[in-house]
């Protein structure tokens, strides 16, 4: 398939730049614009060197070129505070927005759990939850598809060096958004999320702990099989996703211990927390792109849809 869907990246920081490297390998996505607000940004400079068009005028600098350059998908890797306005202006032009901030104005997307359903719904904005959500919600979903989960709790530990200013600014949103997604996507009746930023040197890879309380006695064999099947699904786009220990059963509590090592595209391998976000976003966009190229989805400007 030689035709590709043109994409814009908003936010030339750690996540935006790593995502750019992944999109350049994609058989169906073609990154053509990088959008920032700081003319001295390293990310903008790097994107220019790779042949992308760039603007330091924010989304204002991109909008006049969207239709002329055929941009159909935009990735927003800025912050929760500006995402709603970015999304509104882009979807009005018929651009599908993949949200890598915790803004969560569109439905949550965790690829191995609900991506197929979202593609079928033809939404114009999907939210990639958070790094902790992408790492842990597949495990909660793997348990809840076997039997009801009344409580799901996750603890995501990331290295201080992999937590940029955007991550630090959005910590409250991280906990709220991840907790909601544990319930809405993971299937737990109640969800809770905790993030720990670890200053250890040398930096440690992302580690995640998942605890679930089931309504009834856990079916150990079925839950174990379900978790191992889900691990394989996540590894299709995040090869460094590993089950370190578990599932461990203690009465009605099921615990799973994970680590996530990045591919090392642009970010160091210990930044698995950022890598799982960019890999999930790229996977999501690829599935939408395949549907657009096959003629099964025709993106419409939101102004005309309303």
From Swiss-Prot:
Which InterPro entries does this UniProt record tie to the protein? Acetaldehyde_dehydrogenase, Acetylaldehyde_DH_C, NAD(P)-bd_dom_sf, Semialdehyde_DH_NAD-bd
Q: Which SUPFAM superfamilies match?
A: Glyceraldehyde-3-phosphate dehydrogenase-like, C-terminal domain, NAD(P)-binding Rossmann-fold domains
Which positions bind NAD(+)?
A: 162-170, 273
Q: Which reaction does it catalyse?
A: acetaldehyde + NAD(+) + CoA = acetyl-CoA + NADH + H(+)
Q: Does the keyword GTP-binding apply?
A: no
Principal EC category: oxidoreductase
Recite the UniProt keywords alphabetically.
Answer: Aromatic hydrocarbons catabolism, NAD, Oxidoreductase
Molecular functions per Gene Ontology: acetaldehyde dehydrogenase (acetylating) activity; NAD binding
Q: Which domain of life is it from?
A: Bacteria
Q: EC number(s) of the enzyme?
A: 1.2.1.10
**What SMART domains does the record point to?**
Semialdhyde_dh
One BP annotation, GO: catabolic process
**Could you name the active-site residues?**
131 (acyl-thioester intermediate)
For this chain, the family text in UniProt reads: Belongs to the acetaldehyde dehydrogenase family.
The protein's name in its UniProt record: Acetaldehyde dehydrogenase
Q: Which organism is it from?
A: Albidiferax ferrireducens (strain ATCC BAA-621 / DSM 15236 / T118)
């Amino acid at each position: 398939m030689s035709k590709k869907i043109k994409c814009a990246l908003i936010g030339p920081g750690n996540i935006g730049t790593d995502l750019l490297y992944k999109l350049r390998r994609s058989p169906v996505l073609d990154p053509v614009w990088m959008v920032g607000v700081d003319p001295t940004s390293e990310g903008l400079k790097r994107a220019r060197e790779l042949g992308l068009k760039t603007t330091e005028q924010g989304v204002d600098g991109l909008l006049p070129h969207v239709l002329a350059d055929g941009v159909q998908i935009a990735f927003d890797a800025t912050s929760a505070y500006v995402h709603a306005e970015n999304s509104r202006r882009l979807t009005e032009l018929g651009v599908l927005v993949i949200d890598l901030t915790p803004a969560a104005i569109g439905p949550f997307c965790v690829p191995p759990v609900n991506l197929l359903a979202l593609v079928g719904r033809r939404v114009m904005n999907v939210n990639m939850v958070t790094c902790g959500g992408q790492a842990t919600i597949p495990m909660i979903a793997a348990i809840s598809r076997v039997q009801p989960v009344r409580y799901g709790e996750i603890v995501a530990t990331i290295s201080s060096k992999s937590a940029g200013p955007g991550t630090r600014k959005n910590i409250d949103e991280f906990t709220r958004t991840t907790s909601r997604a544990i319930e809405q996507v993971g299937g737990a009746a109640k969800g809770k999320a905790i993030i720990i930023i670890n200053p250890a040197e040398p930096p440690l890879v992302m580690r995640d702990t998942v605890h679930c309380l089931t309504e009834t006695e856990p079916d150990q064999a079925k839950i174990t099989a379900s978790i191992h099947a889900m691990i394989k699904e996540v590894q299709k786009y995040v090869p460094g996703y590993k089950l370190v220990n578990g599932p461990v059963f203690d009465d009605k509590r099921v615990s799973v211990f994970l680590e996530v090592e990045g591919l090392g595209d642009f970010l160091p391998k210990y930044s698995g927390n950022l890598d799982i976000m960019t890999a999930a976003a790229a996977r999501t966009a690829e599935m939408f792109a395949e549907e657009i190229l096959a003629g099964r989805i025709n993106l419409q400007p939101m102004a005309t849809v309303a």
